[in-house]
């Protein structure tokens, strides 16, 4: 049992330090992913591409092209189709490497995969200004290449947590790790707004230079402090190493160093896996809709100008970050104290997260003129409550298929990446004039998808390691010499 081995403190510890380094890795990864969404606002000269017709009145205020673009004059004369091509190109690359990332991490180690993908993304990010000034097609190809590299990053991190994360600490450790993505969003929005106006080389290029350098520096730290497994980490204490190895082996078997073959048929026919994928797609639909469309929604409904947009749009992501970590602590506490089983903890997290987000988003769409603060409160609450999903499907990947968590999550990321392509296009199609009624349709659609995803997850999810994921010695793991009751207790507490 897990209690048979003395539990070393989580803070400070090597496993928690690894989660902090991964936190900053996710932070810089998301900064490189989302920088274009905001930079393009000051890259494109809307005065030249606008039809000259005044925008729809926002609560009685007519927004002319000059007013809506602040003091920034864009360098490029791109129309909306070109801008959309540049913004969506990332996801066309992103969708192509998810499964590869999990497989490579299992075979060669997550440390190397994360290092190569983030370093490559950082170097290509530094080339964004050169590509943009060459042609919009060169920029789109470059963004697709960045997406391809980043597609392998998160499955590789998940693969590492399958061997680094004791089952009863997974919610906290993965929560800290992936919360970095939200802080990346918080930083990149106001940073981009500031650099657009005051940055060097024309303003917007400095966004890519600064973030790219940050990415390169992070990879140097990562290579020094990380290790594929606790057994190979040079600075971990013997007590912590033994605790992690014993806890992980109790649920997935003893690692023999062999690389197991992936049971694709069993994965693709597993209801528990499809439950994660359904929740994953729904959660990402909501996230991508808000990530790409939130600035436009706030501008259309509230009439915010460029200089204030970044700061306001960051507020929901701060709440999101706090909720992810609080949810992880709460989930692990409920499980360790026996208040809820693993399965019911994951169900509760997904139902509250996704349905709650949908309710708040729909409510925000019905706020009237003069209720700007209320709109922001609703959006913030919706984003915050959605952070509980990190204690749902995200951790559940590690619980149902520890040896194949990177591959299974990578496949889920491939499916959910479609949301990154489809949801912005749907939002643009439904909001040609940016009216409140049009945005209400977008928010109702998002709420419907969130609800369906939460229900499917709750019906078909599992809290136990699936039979096909409990490996034998021939398949790469030797089952630990523990009683069956002990294995189940650790995996499903």
From Swiss-Prot:
One of its GO terms (cellular component) is membrane. One of its GO terms (molecular function) is transmembrane transporter activity. The keyword tRNA processing does not apply. It comes from the Eukaryota. Gene3D superfamilies: MFS general substrate transporter like domains. PANTHER family: FI19708P1-RELATED, SOLUTE CARRIER FAMILY 17. This is Uncharacterized transporter slc-17.2. It comes from Caenorhabditis elegans.
């Amino acid at each position: 049992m897990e209690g048979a081995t003395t539990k070393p403190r989580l803070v400070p510890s090597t496993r928690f330090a690894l989660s902090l380094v991964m936190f900053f890795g996710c932070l810089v990864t998301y900064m490189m992913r989302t920088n274009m969404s905001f930079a393009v606002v000051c890259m494109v000269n809307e005065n030249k591409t606008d039809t000259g017709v005044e925008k729809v009145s926002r609560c009685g205020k007519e927004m002319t092209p000059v007013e809506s673009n602040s003091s920034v004059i864009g360098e490029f004369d791109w129309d909306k189709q070109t801008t959309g091509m540049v913004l969506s190109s990332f996801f066309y690359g992103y969708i192509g490497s998810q499964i590869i990332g999990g497989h490579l991490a299992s075979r060669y180690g997550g440390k190397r995969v994360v290092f190569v993908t983030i370093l490559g993304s950082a170097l290509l990010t530094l080339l964004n200004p050169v590509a943009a000034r060459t042609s919009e097609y060169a920029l789109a190809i470059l963004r697709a290449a960045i997406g391809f590299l980043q597609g392998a990053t998160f499955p590789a991190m998940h693969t590492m947590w399958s061997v680094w994360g004791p089952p009863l600490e997974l919610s906290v450790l993965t929560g800290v790790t992936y919360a970095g993505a939200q802080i990346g969003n918080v930083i990149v929005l106001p940073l981009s707004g500031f650099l657009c106006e005051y940055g060097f080389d024309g303003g917007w290029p400095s966004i890519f230079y600064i973030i790219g350098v940050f990415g390169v520096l992070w990879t140097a730290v990562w290579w020094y402090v990380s290790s594929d497994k606790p057994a190979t980490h040079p600075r971990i204490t013997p007590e912590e190493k033994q605790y992690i190895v014993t806890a992980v082996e109790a649920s997935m078997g003893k690692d023999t160093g062999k690389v197991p073959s992936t049971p694709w048929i069993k994965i693709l026919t597993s209801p528990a896996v499809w439950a994660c994928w359904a929740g994953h797609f729904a959660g990402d639909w909501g996230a991508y809709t808000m990530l790409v469309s939130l600035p436009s929604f706030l501008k259309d409904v509230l009439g915010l100008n460029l200089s204030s947009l970044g700061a306001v749009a960051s507020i929901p992501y701060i709440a999101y970050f706090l909720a992810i970590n609080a949810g992880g602590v709460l989930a692990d506490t409920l499980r360790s104290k026996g208040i809820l089983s693993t399965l019911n903890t994951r169900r509760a997290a997904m139902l509250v997260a996704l349905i709650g987000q949908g309710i708040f988003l729909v409510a925000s769409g019905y706020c009237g003129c003069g209720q700007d603060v209320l709109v922001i409160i609703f959006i913030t609450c919706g984003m915050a409550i959605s952070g509980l999903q990190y204690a749902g499907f995200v951790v559940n990947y590690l619980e149902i298929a520890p040896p194949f968590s990177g591959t299974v999550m990578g496949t889920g990321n491939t499916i959910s990446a479609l949301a990154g392509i489809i949801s912005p296009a749907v939002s643009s199609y439904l909001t040609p004039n940016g009216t409140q009624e049009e945005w209400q349709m977008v928010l109702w659609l998002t709420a419907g998808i969130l609800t369906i995803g939460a229900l499917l997850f709750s019906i078909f999810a599992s809290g136990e390691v699936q039979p096909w994921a409990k490996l034998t010695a021939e398949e790469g793991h030797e089952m630990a010499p523990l009683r069956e009751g002990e294995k189940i207790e650790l995996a499903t507490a």
